[in-house]
Amino acid sequence: MPVPTIQKIEVQGFTWSVAGITHRRAFHYDTGSSLTFSGGTLRVTADNGVVGEFAGWRHDPKAVAGAAARYLGQPALDRERFYQQAKRSGVMAIYDIALWDLAGKMADVPAHALMGTYRTEVPAYASTIDGAVGGPLSTPESFADFAEACRDMGYQGFKIHPYAWTDVRQHVATVLAVGERVGGEMDLMIDPYCLFDTFADALKVGRACDEAGFFWLEDPYSDGGITPFSHTKLREMIRTPLLQGEQVSTVEERMALILAKATDFARADVGRHGLTGALKLAHAAETVGLDIEPHRSGPAELQFLAAVKNANYYEVVWVHPVMRDSEPPIYANVSITGLDCIDDRGMVQVPEGPGLGIIYDWDYINAHA
């Protein structure tokens, strides 16, 4: 059977608005505010008529369209070659995911079956939007209230994206309040995403995490998550595991953090490295006995989790007691984003259709193009 070639590439931008969200240094809830996000869709058609699709990404559609020449006329199954040629490109992952969708549709199996299926459902954690001034998620007690509500829904984990200011006392108080309320009943995490100005502040929060029994502390201070020495030092001084890697660019750099003993968990990023690159990190980490944790929500992340053993959770990202979903409503056949995407056991089902398993709501996408 001849290998199909890529015959046509279509890129379409669209926008979606999320009520109750604003951005001042970080995204957080604000009654009466609304933000409009921009992203797009990619359709890759092979000469056998099979179409690979990926929608909902947040890149400049012109940049995605500008990369089309690299792929047109090329073998549609050469994902590894495309990855090696463009792994530092910001749009490579979008094409990679669409090509995995195409390959799965050609074989009439989910993408995870091509990678090697390990499971078909995954546990999820609720990953909050940042703390705000006033309203829900503005105090340690309100974070604890939300953690308790998520526990009652079935969530097995809860991650705090804390306040966008650096008063470490409030961050410590929030860690302790959440730990006191639901500690021992959920895995607890905190992600300041490189907020704290000093090693000392990171250490204070880390020691609070120790006291509260947190599962991990992620990207604590403003080095950008890239200095192995300081994170190795922090690991020596606290018991709570570190999760690092989101802020560094390549799979190789993330693996280097592992080998430098600068992290306990490594952040995998399907949206940055594609399924091809994320699998490389997962398998490399597995050889040294460590886990990876995928970033963000979406169909590609679920296909990835279905194919790897050494990952613990699906991140249901940017949730809030009032604003329950920040992702565009573009999945017509599945519920895989937003606070309500879990079942009562805290699990999310991996889409089982061919490729990514997604039927897109093209009426919504076209209406917002």
Task: Explain the meaning of each model-derived region.
Residues 96-136:
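Glycine-rich, aromatic-flanked loop segments that form ligand/cofactor-binding clefts
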